[in-house]
UniProtKB/Swiss-Prot annotation:
Propeptide boundaries: 1-23
Keyword rRNA-binding belongs to the record: no
Cell location: Cytoplasm; Nucleus
Entry keyword set: Cytoplasm, Nucleus, Proteasome
Primary location: cytoplasm
Protein family per UniProt: Belongs to the peptidase T1B family.
Active site: T24 (nucleophile)
This protein's name: Proteasome subunit beta type-4
Claim: Amino-acid biosynthesis is one of the keywords in the record: no
Organism of origin: Xenopus laevis (African clawed frog)
Gene of this entry: psmb4
Entries under PANTHER family matching the protein: METALLOPROTEASE TLDD (PTHR32194), PROTEASOME SUBUNIT BETA (PTHR32194:SF6)
Gene Ontology BP term (one): proteolysis involved in protein catabolic process
Function: Non-catalytic component of the proteasome, a multicatalytic proteinase complex which is characterized by its ability to cleave peptides with Arg, Phe, Tyr, Leu, and Glu adjacent to the leaving group at neutral or slightly basic pH. The proteasome has an ATP-dependent proteolytic activity.
Protein backbone atom coordinates (compact mmCIF):
# COMPACT_ATOMS: atom_id res chain seq x y z
CA UNK A 1 0.00 0.00 0.00
CA UNK A 2 2.78 2.44 0.99
CA UNK A 3 4.53 1.70 -2.34
CA UNK A 4 1.39 2.67 -4.25
CA UNK A 5 0.84 5.97 -2.39
CA UNK A 6 4.54 6.77 -2.03
CA UNK A 7 6.48 7.47 1.14
CA UNK A 8 5.35 10.38 3.31
CA UNK A 9 8.00 12.89 4.45
CA UNK A 10 9.91 11.49 7.42
CA UNK A 11 8.51 7.99 6.89
CA UNK A 12 10.90 5.06 6.49
CA UNK A 13 10.36 2.54 3.75
CA UNK A 14 12.05 -0.86 3.53
CA UNK A 15 12.81 -1.89 -0.03
CA UNK A 16 13.05 -5.62 -0.79
CA UNK A 17 16.56 -6.63 0.30
CA UNK A 18 19.10 -8.27 -1.98
CA UNK A 19 22.84 -8.48 -1.54
CA UNK A 20 25.15 -7.05 -4.19
CA UNK A 21 26.14 -9.43 -6.96
CA UNK A 22 29.84 -9.30 -7.75
CA UNK A 23 31.55 -10.75 -10.79
CA UNK A 24 35.21 -11.39 -11.57
CA UNK A 25 35.65 -8.90 -14.37
CA UNK A 26 39.42 -9.02 -14.28
CA UNK A 27 41.84 -11.22 -12.35
CA UNK A 28 44.06 -9.72 -9.63
CA UNK A 29 46.96 -11.97 -8.57
CA UNK A 30 47.71 -14.28 -11.49
CA UNK A 31 49.97 -17.17 -12.39
CA UNK A 32 51.44 -17.72 -15.85
CA UNK A 33 52.05 -20.93 -17.86
CA UNK A 34 51.48 -24.51 -16.74
CA UNK A 35 53.12 -27.33 -18.73
CA UNK A 36 51.95 -30.94 -18.94
CA UNK A 37 53.57 -33.92 -20.70
CA UNK A 38 52.50 -37.56 -20.92
CA UNK A 39 55.22 -40.19 -20.75
CA UNK A 40 55.34 -43.97 -20.70
CA UNK A 41 53.91 -44.80 -17.28
CA UNK A 42 52.74 -41.41 -16.06
CA UNK A 43 52.41 -37.65 -16.45
CA UNK A 44 54.59 -34.68 -15.52
CA UNK A 45 53.22 -31.18 -14.74
CA UNK A 46 55.33 -28.07 -14.15
CA UNK A 47 54.55 -24.48 -13.13
CA UNK A 48 56.53 -21.62 -11.69
CA UNK A 49 55.84 -20.22 -8.21
CA UNK A 50 55.14 -16.57 -9.03
CA UNK A 51 51.92 -14.71 -8.28
CA UNK A 52 51.92 -11.51 -10.35
CA UNK A 53 49.91 -8.45 -9.32
CA UNK A 54 49.51 -6.96 -12.78
CA UNK A 55 53.12 -6.78 -13.96
CA UNK A 56 54.54 -6.69 -10.40
CA UNK A 57 56.25 -9.94 -9.31
CA UNK A 58 54.38 -9.79 -5.98
CA UNK A 59 54.32 -13.31 -4.47
CA UNK A 60 57.39 -15.37 -5.29
CA UNK A 61 56.81 -18.59 -3.41
CA UNK A 62 53.27 -19.81 -4.07
CA UNK A 63 52.40 -23.27 -5.35
CA UNK A 64 50.11 -23.58 -8.38
CA UNK A 65 50.16 -27.38 -8.51
CA UNK A 66 48.11 -29.55 -6.17
CA UNK A 67 48.03 -33.25 -5.42
CA UNK A 68 44.38 -34.30 -5.66
CA UNK A 69 44.96 -37.90 -4.56
CA UNK A 70 47.51 -40.68 -5.16
CA UNK A 71 46.72 -40.86 -8.88
CA UNK A 72 45.78 -37.29 -9.85
CA UNK A 73 47.56 -33.93 -9.95
CA UNK A 74 46.31 -30.51 -11.06
CA UNK A 75 48.02 -27.28 -12.12
CA UNK A 76 46.34 -23.92 -12.70
CA UNK A 77 47.23 -20.64 -14.37
CA UNK A 78 45.15 -17.47 -14.13
CA UNK A 79 43.58 -15.94 -11.03
CA UNK A 80 45.20 -17.30 -7.86
CA UNK A 81 42.19 -16.64 -5.61
CA UNK A 82 39.95 -18.67 -7.94
CA UNK A 83 42.55 -21.48 -7.89
CA UNK A 84 42.54 -21.43 -4.06
CA UNK A 85 38.73 -21.70 -4.11
CA UNK A 86 38.87 -24.64 -6.54
CA UNK A 87 41.56 -26.33 -4.43
CA UNK A 88 39.42 -25.98 -1.31
CA UNK A 89 36.37 -27.49 -3.03
CA UNK A 90 38.37 -30.38 -4.54
CA UNK A 91 40.15 -31.14 -1.24
CA UNK A 92 36.77 -31.38 0.50
CA UNK A 93 35.36 -33.59 -2.29
CA UNK A 94 38.29 -35.98 -1.87
CA UNK A 95 37.77 -36.11 1.92
CA UNK A 96 34.03 -36.78 1.49
CA UNK A 97 34.82 -39.57 -0.99
CA UNK A 98 37.35 -41.17 1.38
CA UNK A 99 34.85 -41.07 4.27
CA UNK A 100 32.55 -43.43 2.34
CA UNK A 101 35.29 -46.05 2.77
CA UNK A 102 34.30 -48.15 -0.25
CA UNK A 103 37.82 -48.34 -1.68
CA UNK A 104 37.01 -46.07 -4.61
CA UNK A 105 38.51 -42.65 -5.28
CA UNK A 106 38.34 -40.01 -8.01
CA UNK A 107 40.09 -40.84 -11.27
CA UNK A 108 41.87 -38.11 -13.27
CA UNK A 109 39.14 -38.38 -15.91
CA UNK A 110 36.43 -37.84 -13.27
CA UNK A 111 38.12 -34.70 -11.92
CA UNK A 112 38.56 -33.42 -15.50
CA UNK A 113 34.91 -34.06 -16.34
CA UNK A 114 33.72 -32.44 -13.10
CA UNK A 115 35.85 -29.36 -13.78
CA UNK A 116 34.33 -28.91 -17.26
CA UNK A 117 30.88 -28.73 -15.62
CA UNK A 118 32.00 -26.30 -12.90
CA UNK A 119 33.79 -23.97 -15.35
CA UNK A 120 30.91 -23.97 -17.85
CA UNK A 121 28.36 -23.40 -15.08
CA UNK A 122 30.27 -20.41 -13.71
CA UNK A 123 30.80 -18.87 -17.15
CA UNK A 124 27.07 -19.27 -17.84
CA UNK A 125 26.40 -17.16 -14.73
CA UNK A 126 28.71 -14.48 -16.20
CA UNK A 127 30.98 -15.05 -13.20
CA UNK A 128 33.77 -17.35 -14.39
CA UNK A 129 36.55 -18.92 -12.38
CA UNK A 130 39.38 -17.13 -14.20
CA UNK A 131 41.67 -20.14 -14.60
CA UNK A 132 43.07 -22.53 -17.15
CA UNK A 133 43.53 -25.91 -15.50
CA UNK A 134 45.73 -28.87 -16.45
CA UNK A 135 44.80 -32.26 -14.96
CA UNK A 136 47.27 -35.13 -15.05
CA UNK A 137 47.07 -38.64 -13.72
CA UNK A 138 47.82 -42.33 -13.98
CA UNK A 139 44.85 -44.64 -13.43
CA UNK A 140 44.15 -48.27 -14.38
CA UNK A 141 47.47 -48.46 -16.24
CA UNK A 142 46.77 -45.39 -18.40
CA UNK A 143 48.29 -41.91 -18.44
CA UNK A 144 45.79 -39.04 -18.59
CA UNK A 145 46.41 -35.39 -19.45
CA UNK A 146 43.52 -32.96 -19.85
CA UNK A 147 42.83 -29.23 -20.23
CA UNK A 148 39.91 -27.07 -19.07
CA UNK A 149 39.67 -23.30 -19.46
CA UNK A 150 37.43 -20.65 -17.89
CA UNK A 151 34.73 -21.16 -20.55
CA UNK A 152 34.53 -24.92 -20.00
CA UNK A 153 36.42 -25.72 -23.23
CA UNK A 154 38.11 -29.07 -22.64
CA UNK A 155 40.30 -31.61 -24.41
CA UNK A 156 42.88 -34.32 -23.81
CA UNK A 157 46.33 -34.22 -25.41
CA UNK A 158 49.82 -35.75 -25.06
CA UNK A 159 51.26 -32.28 -24.31
CA UNK A 160 49.53 -29.22 -22.88
CA UNK A 161 50.77 -25.69 -22.23
CA UNK A 162 48.65 -22.82 -20.89
CA UNK A 163 49.14 -19.06 -20.95
CA UNK A 164 52.22 -17.77 -22.75
CA UNK A 165 53.48 -21.37 -22.81
CA UNK A 166 50.89 -22.14 -25.50
CA UNK A 167 52.98 -19.97 -27.84
CA UNK A 168 56.52 -20.56 -26.55
CA UNK A 169 56.61 -24.04 -25.01
CA UNK A 170 53.97 -25.98 -26.96
CA UNK A 171 55.97 -25.94 -30.25
CA UNK A 172 59.00 -27.32 -28.38
CA UNK A 173 56.88 -29.99 -26.68
CA UNK A 174 55.24 -31.05 -29.95
CA UNK A 175 58.54 -31.12 -31.83
CA UNK A 176 59.72 -33.89 -29.51
CA UNK A 177 56.47 -35.81 -28.92
CA UNK A 178 55.35 -35.90 -32.56
CA UNK A 179 58.57 -37.63 -33.60
CA UNK A 180 58.45 -40.28 -30.88
CA UNK A 181 55.66 -42.72 -30.10
CA UNK A 182 56.27 -42.50 -26.34
CA UNK A 183 58.67 -40.64 -24.09
CA UNK A 184 60.49 -42.11 -21.11
CA UNK A 185 60.21 -40.40 -17.73
CA UNK A 186 63.76 -39.02 -18.10
CA UNK A 187 63.07 -37.64 -21.60
CA UNK A 188 59.86 -35.95 -20.42
CA UNK A 189 61.70 -34.43 -17.46
CA UNK A 190 64.50 -33.03 -19.66
CA UNK A 191 61.92 -31.60 -22.07
CA UNK A 192 59.98 -29.87 -19.30
CA UNK A 193 63.22 -28.49 -17.79
CA UNK A 194 64.16 -27.01 -21.18
CA UNK A 195 60.72 -25.46 -21.65
CA UNK A 196 60.75 -23.89 -18.17
CA UNK A 197 64.11 -22.30 -18.99
CA UNK A 198 62.82 -20.93 -22.32
CA UNK A 199 59.75 -19.52 -20.56
CA UNK A 200 61.92 -17.80 -17.96
CA UNK A 201 64.00 -16.22 -20.71
CA UNK A 202 61.04 -15.12 -22.83
CA UNK A 203 57.95 -14.63 -20.64
CA UNK A 204 58.10 -11.45 -18.56
CA UNK A 205 55.50 -12.85 -16.10
CA UNK A 206 57.52 -15.99 -15.30
CA UNK A 207 60.03 -16.62 -12.52
CA UNK A 208 63.06 -18.84 -12.07
CA UNK A 209 61.56 -20.84 -9.23
CA UNK A 210 59.27 -23.68 -10.18
CA UNK A 211 57.78 -27.01 -9.15
CA UNK A 212 57.73 -30.22 -11.14
CA UNK A 213 55.19 -32.85 -10.13
CA UNK A 214 55.15 -36.40 -11.46
CA UNK A 215 52.41 -38.99 -11.13
CA UNK A 216 53.10 -42.67 -11.83
CA UNK A 217 51.80 -46.05 -10.68
CA UNK A 218 53.75 -45.60 -7.45
CA UNK A 219 52.04 -42.30 -6.61
CA UNK A 220 52.71 -38.57 -6.72
CA UNK A 221 56.16 -37.01 -6.42
CA UNK A 222 56.51 -33.24 -5.93
CA UNK A 223 59.89 -31.64 -6.61
CA UNK A 224 60.73 -28.06 -5.84
CA UNK A 225 61.33 -25.25 -5.53
CA UNK A 226 63.77 -25.75 -8.43
CA UNK A 227 65.57 -23.26 -10.65
CA UNK A 228 67.29 -23.35 -14.06
CA UNK A 229 70.89 -22.48 -14.82
CA UNK A 230 70.71 -19.31 -16.92
CA UNK A 231 73.20 -17.40 -19.05
CA UNK A 232 72.62 -13.74 -19.92
CA UNK A 233 75.96 -13.06 -21.64
CA UNK A 234 74.35 -12.31 -25.02
CA UNK A 235 71.59 -10.13 -23.54
CA UNK A 236 73.38 -6.88 -24.50
CA UNK A 237 73.39 -7.95 -28.16
CA UNK A 238 69.59 -8.14 -28.29
CA UNK A 239 68.19 -4.71 -29.13
CA UNK A 240 65.35 -3.10 -31.02
CA UNK A 241 62.59 -4.44 -28.75
CA UNK A 242 62.46 -1.48 -26.37
Amino acid sequence: ESVARGTAPGELHCFPGAGPVRHTLNPMVTGTSVLGVKFDGGVIIAADMLGSYGSLARFRNISRIMKVNENTILGASGDYADYQYLKQVIDQMVIDEELVGDGHNYSPKAIHSWLTRVMYNRRSKMNPLWNTVVIGGFYNGESFLGYVDKLGVAYEAPTIATGFGAYLAQPLLREVTENKATLSKEEARQLVDRCMKVLYYRDARSYNRFEITTVTESGVEVEGPLSSETNWEIAHLISGFE
